[in-house]
A protein has these predicted regions:
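Short, well-ordered loop/turn elements at secondary-structure boundaries
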Residues: 31-33, 68, 134-136, 156-159, ...
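Electropositive nucleic-acid engagement tracts
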Residues: 1-49, 128, 163, 181-208
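Bulky hydrophobic/aromatic packing residues
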Residues: 13, 37-38, 44, 58, ...
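Electropositive, glycine- and tryptophan-enriched low-complexity nucleic-acid-binding patches
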Residues: 2-6, 61-137, 234-241
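Active-site-proximal, Lys/Arg-enriched surface segment
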Residues: 12-93, 104, 221-227
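Long, contiguous hydrophobic alpha-helical segments, chiefly transmembrane helices and signal peptides
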Residues: 4-7, 37-38, 54, 58, ...
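An anionic, glycine-rich sequence signature occurring as long contiguous blocks
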Residues: 80-107, 111, 165-241
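Domain-level cores of phosphate- or acyl-group-handling catalytic modules
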Residues: 103-182
């Protein structure tokens, strides 16, 4: 382990070149016009002061706030298989303050690095995928960290569809045709829509589990995610319980 740490941290090697070769090989094996690019964050529990970007933040692995490092990852999936294709370390904003100056030097943090939110890091990676043209894809999927970010969604490539999780307290406008009347109504939370007795649910197979199919009730409702009435703000809201 120590030898690997020395190799990764002290020896000179072209990380960008290795990552580029990895993408080329994955693309050669997996790329497909109907491919899916998935965005997610993942954390590693970390203690001490000798590792960059360690902070008291949400750790998805533990489901609670803990000292950890957090990264944003990009995966590619097609009918041919799946693989991770890119990554960015998320550096919390406080790490750029004066009180962290010595720790930045000790951890050899690049001086030109600037703070970026996780959705920004994800957008950068997706834009790089499009720029290189190695991977064909039609879909982008993400969880609430990215689905709740209007900037992330607005900056996605125009040619892709997006399946994004959003928070249950997110407010949207129900499309008038699906309301009892066509008058402009106030926004409602996703959880309130899910509790509405008028919503029709259908039992569907969600996935294949180790002990058989995983079933759940699903529904969909046409909504506006922003200024109601504008066609560009219309979305399908998919519900599951």
């Amino acid at each position: 382990v120590r030898n690997l740490q020395r190799f990764m941290g002290e020896y000179k090697w072209d990380e960008d070149l290795i990552a580029s070769r990895h993408k080329e090989e994955v693309a050669r094996l997996l790329t497909d016009p109907e491919g899916v690019v998935s965005v997610d964050s993942s954390e590693v529990v970390k203690k001490g002061k000798d590792s960059v970007a360690v902070a008291h933040q949400y750790c998805g692995r533990l489901g609670k706030i803990e000292n950890c490092q957090s990264g944003v990852y990009l995966a590619y999936t097609s009918t041919k298989g799946y693989a991770l294709i890119d990554r960015r370390l998320f550096v919390p904003e406080k790490w750029f303050g004066q009180e962290y100056e010595e720790r930045r030097k000790k951890c050899k943090m690049p001086q030109d690095l600037v703070f970026k939110k996780k959705p920004e890091l994800a957008n950068e990676m997706i834009q790089e995928v499009c720029k290189r043209g190695l991977f064909s894809f039609r879909w982008v999927t993400c969880d609430t960290i990215f689905g709740n970010s209007p900037e992330f969604l607005q900056n996605l490539p125009e040619h892709v569809f997006c399946l994004a999780e959003i928070a249950k307290n997110r407010k949207v406008w129900i499309k008038p045709e699906e309301s009892r009347d066509r008058k402009k109504r106030p926004p409602v939370s996703v959880s309130d829509i899910a509790r509405d007795e008028k919503v029709a649910w259908k039992l569907s197979k969600l996935a294949e589990g180790a002990k058989g199919p995983i079933l759940g009730f699903v529904s969909r409702v046409r909504v506006y995610v922003d200024d109601p009435g504008k066609a560009e703000n219309e979305r399908w809201l998919f519900l599951r319980k």
